[in-house]
Amino acid sequence: MRERYLYLADTPQGILMSGQVPEYQFWLLAEISPVHSEKVINALRDYLVMGYNRMEACGRHSVSPGYFSGALKRFQRVSQTVYRLVPFYFPEAGHEVHRGE
């Protein structure tokens, strides 16, 4: 059985779930995400990697819940885009290449 290092291969359409994202994958996504605030990135890490609930993650890093939700949505969008790119780089990944929506 092939070991999987990236969580997106196991989730529907690249959706990230709280507490289930590997640290390495999180930092790769953070590199290409439009989120630049260190506080928000740390709150997202607490939520996605460490498994804190949204309020705990926001409280630990002094991030407003509304801003956190917007940043999480942008982060999810990056993950979903990466998911759609995978077949262009790894055709054996098993999901179809869509030429547009």
UniProtKB/Swiss-Prot annotation:
Name under which the protein is recorded: AFA-III adhesin operon regulatory protein
Superkingdom in the source lineage: Bacteria
InterPro entries the UniProt entry points to: Adhesin_operon_reg_prot, Fimbrial_Adhesin_Reg
Gene: afaA
The protein's role, per its UniProt record: Regulates the transcription of genes involved in the biosynthesis of afimbrial adhesin-III.
Keyword RNA-binding (UniProt): no
Species this protein is from: Escherichia coli
GO biological process, one term: regulation of DNA-templated transcription
UniProt entry keywords in alphabetical sequence: Activator, Plasmid, Transcription, Transcription regulation
Listed Pfam families: PapB (PF03333)
